[in-house]
Amino acid sequence: MVESLPTTFSDSVHIAVIGGTGLQSLEGFIPIATINPLTPWGYPSAPIHILSHNNTPIAFLSRHGTHHELAPHEIPNRANIAALRSMGVRTIIAFSAVGSLREEIKPRDFVVPDQVIDRTKGVRPFTFFEKGVVGHVGFADPFDERIAKVVRECGHALEGEGIVLHDKGTIICMEGPAFSTRAESHMYRSWGGSVINMSALPEAKLAREAEMVYQMICMATDYDCWHSTADVDVEMVMGHMHANGQNAKRLVGAVLDALNMRWSTIDSIRRRKNKPELANAQQHQIWRGRTYHFAWSISACYFSSE
């Protein structure tokens, strides 16, 4: 990114992309600003890049830091979500490298998960609800089916160009940074796990608490250790990561185009009905439907019923 970019951005940004291992930047997008918001939970993993995609501002955050210096248990997830929320973000598309727990999910394949099993150990701060702020959110369906549908449509449209996409799957989110034992890997398969990573949680839970729409896109780099014949070496994994990163950039561009098209249509309908207040900064409301409104200040957050 260009170092001389502005460090403030006054307009709301409604869509964010969180990049993980293998997707630490989004080349080809026009950089607008680089900001580093201070939240009640500290600074985010890295400065947030505001990029322009077809004249729409997009926020990009590198989950593991600018130079991939943060291990999964060191990621300031609350600060990341709070920083994006304070900028106006209401929709998050998150990418993550994963190990495959299924023969049919091959390295370089993409998975649009619909479920997650939490195998983290409580080491990571995992909620905004504390210190007198009490709240409970539903998490039966941890990812957003509306965004998932868009991702599936775009992914399948690109299948002739090297992208293979699986429509559903269950993530096993482990604590890390060590990988699974072979016994654990077989256990996760018996539970119905499709892929395994270290990043889905508490990121998805915090996004739900913050009333943000969240969908993860998984990029398989290798088979987990349950697989007896698929040897893994660093060179092979890095090759898969590079290919995944290139495919992810094409996929995210297509997804953003599709989302913008939907929002533009809703925007024009609302304007024709003489409701411009619903068509500008409040476009994100089409993705809402939660029980609480989330309000931020520099020092605290609170929830109030609708």
Swiss-Prot record:
Keyword set, alphabetical order: Cytoplasm, Glycosyltransferase, Nucleus, Purine salvage, Transferase
Cellular component, GO annotation: cytosol; nucleus
InterPro entries linked: MTAP, Nucleoside_phosphorylase_d, Nucleoside_phosphorylase_sf, Purine_phosphorylase-2_CS
Example of a GO biological process term: glutamate biosynthetic process
Residues annotated to bind phosphate: 21, 63-64, 96-97, 199
Broadest EC class assigned to this enzyme: transferase
This protein's pathway: Amino-acid biosynthesis; L-methionine biosynthesis via salvage pathway; S-methyl-5-thio-alpha-D-ribose 1-phosphate from S-methyl-5'-thioadenosine (phosphorylase route): step 1/1
Catalytic reaction list: S-methyl-5'-thioadenosine + phosphate = 5-(methylsulfanyl)-alpha-D-ribose 1-phosphate + adenine
Binding-site residues, substrate: 198, 222-224
Domain of life, per lineage: Eukaryota
EC number: 2.4.2.28
PANTHER family associated with the record: S-METHYL-5'-THIOADENOSINE PHOSPHORYLASE
NCBIfam families: MTAP
Described function: Catalyzes the reversible phosphorylation of S-methyl-5'-thioadenosine (MTA) to adenine and 5-methylthioribose-1-phosphate. Involved in the breakdown of MTA, a major by-product of polyamine biosynthesis. Responsible for the first step in the methionine salvage pathway after MTA has been generated from S-adenosylmethionine. Has broad substrate specificity with 6-aminopurine nucleosides as preferred substrates.
Family membership: Belongs to the PNP/MTAP phosphorylase family. MTAP subfamily.
Name this protein carries in UniProt: S-methyl-5'-thioadenosine phosphorylase
Organism: Sclerotinia sclerotiorum (strain ATCC 18683 / 1980 / Ss-1)
UniProt lineage: Eukaryota, Fungi, Dikarya, Ascomycota, Pezizomycotina
